[in-house]
Amino acid sequence: MRKSFYTWLMTERNPKSNSPKAILADLAFEEAAFPKHTDDFDEVSRFLEEHASFSFNLGDFDAIWQEYLEH
């Protein structure tokens, strides 16, 4: 079974980095409602679009998701 997106993303946390992946990881860590136990693209994408307390470039999210799938 694949790790959840959140679990994988947490390995990329780095407050000193300006990379989109590190930025999203830090924002997701601070967001209590971020979906932590899913590997479903639509669920995470919908959360980012409709419910997140932060804004994030969805084009960057798509690239990060692709990297997640390839890990």
Curated annotation (Swiss-Prot):
Among SUPFAM superfamilies, the record links this protein to:
YozE-like (SSF140652)
What InterPro entries would the database entry show? UPF0346 (IPR010673), YozE_SAM-like (IPR023089), YozE_SAM-like_sf (IPR036806)
List the Pfam families: YozE_SAM_like
Kindly give the Gene3D superfamilies that the UniProt entry links to this protein: YozE SAM-like (1.10.150.260)
Q: Which family does it belong to?
A: Belongs to the UPF0346 family.
Q: What is this protein called?
A: UPF0346 protein SPJ_0886
Give the source species.
Streptococcus pneumoniae (strain JJA)
